[in-house]
């Protein structure tokens, strides 16, 4: 299984770049658990030192990379204390802390102390003048609200004497079944002959499914049924469709939430015994709670008197019954809203369940996930039957499993020899923070060809 994955993105069967000159060297900044180091070493580069301050990440890093043969490799400590390195280097790499621009963080940008670590990056680059660098961050840094911060970063690196380019790359395009967008900033020193020659790698050919990577789930060769947009969307295609949500197919995952609707959306009233009347009440609340007429928030509690205008002959006891079933809740004196009113929280601890034949799972994060993977596949049928079959055969029979830390490692492209941290939660945190190995492999390969 894993060999098939490696063959797909050509990792660990690489053709290391050969040079008659000395081996290219690099320093691993914000080293984490070594996501940059693995592909660079596979490409024939040598690590001279690493910088990291998280003690548990350092333990994982040392367990995997520091052996008798390189026991004298330099631990560089905290980047805030770095200036001139004790040796010349060819390449600087690092995943600069991304929380300041991450949706999962508070998006404070350069106002966040972690965002200010870029000034340490500028200082180390200027002091050491490597031939090139690769820095990784979240896609959020490229979005309009952060464009001034991005310009500031690019301008500082350019003024240090580098030709700088950036691009967002997705892990799926490089052989992993994970929908993970990350921005990479690449710079080549402007006195080098091929400083303008670098171009970002193109997506590799081939496709991979979750069942190719995650053990214990069913492989299938179901041919997906096609539908017209009129059938799927009643002629109104949503504007927020993701990359892996096709316009003529049912989704390969089911979303658990009470505040959105769709053919593959599971609501609490689908899972709890409810009458058709109760379902109607819930659907009415769901369709109206986001309307501006009822408040400025993106989702407002609705008072009984409002609901009574929307639902004929509504009785207070009907609302009370839904409160007793823990589908609705009373919000102070503002009215009624769903108990499960946040998409990120899901229902019963489940946000999404992906089918084994899905092209990609959602982005893995350091804060964990409420995403699960079904252990069996179901045939794509007409929309209502598809949802009913999922609830009956997968949800009710518990034919789904959480992602393990080992699953995280595989979904990030880490090799089987890699030793993950012994604590499951910590291991997931570390792997969710890491770069995807095959993305860096193909990116670094394209870069090294221009600095030899």
Predicted regions and their residues:
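Core alpha/beta nucleotide-donor-binding catalytic domains of modification enzymes
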Residues: 2-129, 135, 139-151
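Proline-centered helix-kink/hinge sites
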Residues: 96-97, 130, 177, 415
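A generic secondary-structure signal for well-formed alpha-helical elements
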Residues: 65, 96, 142-145, 157-161, ...
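Conserved beta-strand scaffold positions in the cores of enzyme catalytic domains, especially
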Residues: 26, 50, 74-75, 164-166, ...
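Class I S-adenosyl-L-methionine
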Residues: 82-89, 104-354
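C-terminal target-recognition/interaction regions appended to catalytic cores
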Residues: 2-3, 8, 254-452
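Short, solvent-exposed loop/turn segments at secondary-structure junctions
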Residues: 34, 55, 97-99, 139-140, ...
């Amino acid at each position: 299984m894993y060999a098939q994955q490696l063959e797909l993105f050509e990792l660990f069967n690489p053709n290391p770049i050969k040079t008659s000159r000395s081996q290219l060297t690099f320093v691993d900044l914000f080293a984490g658990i070594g996501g940059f180091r693995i592909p660079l070493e596979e490409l024939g580069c040598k690590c001279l030192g690493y910088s990291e301050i998280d003690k548990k990440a350092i333990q994982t890093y040392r367990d995997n990379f520091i052996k008798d043969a390189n026991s004298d490799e330099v631990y560089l400590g905290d980047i805030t204390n770095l200036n001139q390195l004790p040796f010349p280097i060819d390449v600087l790499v690092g995943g600069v802390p991304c929380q300041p621009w991450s949706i999962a963080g508070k998006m404070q940008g350069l106002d966040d102390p972690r965002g200010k670590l870029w000034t340490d990056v500028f200082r180390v680059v200027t002091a050491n003048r490597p031939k090139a660098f690769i820095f990784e961050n979240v896609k959020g840094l490229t979005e309009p609200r952060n464009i001034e911060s991005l310009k500031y970063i690019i301008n500082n690196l350019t003024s240090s004497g580098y030709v700088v380019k950036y691009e967002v790359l997705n892990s799926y395009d490089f052989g992993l079944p994970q929908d993970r967008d990350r921005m990479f900033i690449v710079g080549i020193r402007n006195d080098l002959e091929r400083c303008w020659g670098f171009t970002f790698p193109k997506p590799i050919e081939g496709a991979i499914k979750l069942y190719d990577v995650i053990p214990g789930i069913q492989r299938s060769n179901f041919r997906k049924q096609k539908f017209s947009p009129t059938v799927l969307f009643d002629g109104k295609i949503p504007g927020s469709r993701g990359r892996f949500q096709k316009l003529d197919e049912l989704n390969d995952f089911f979303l658990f939430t009470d505040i959105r609707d769709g053919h593959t959306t599971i609501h609490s009233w689908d899972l709890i015994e409810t009458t058709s009347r109760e379902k109607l009440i819930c659907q009415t609340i769901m369709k109206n709670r986001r309307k501006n007429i009822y408040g400025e928030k993106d989702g407002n509690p609705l008072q009984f008197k409002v609901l009574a205008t929307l639902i004929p002959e509504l009785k207070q006891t009907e609302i009370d019954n839904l409160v007793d079933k823990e589908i609705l809740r009373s919000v102070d004196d503002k009215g009624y809203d769903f108990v499960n009113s946040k998409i990120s929280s899901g229902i019963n601890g489940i946000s999404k369940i992906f089918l084994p034949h899905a092209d990609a799972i959602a982005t893995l994060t350091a804060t964990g996930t409420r995403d699960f993977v079904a252990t069996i596949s179901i045939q794509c049928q007409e929309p209502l039957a598809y949802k009913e079959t999922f609830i009956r055969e997968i949800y009710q029979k518990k034919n789904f499993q959480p992602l393990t830390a080992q699953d995280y490692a595989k979904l990030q492209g880490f090799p089987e020899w890699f030793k993950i941290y012994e604590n499951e939660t910590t291991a997931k945190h570390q792997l969710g923070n890491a770069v995807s190995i095959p993305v860096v492999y193909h990116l670094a390969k394209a870069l090294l060809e221009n600095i030899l």
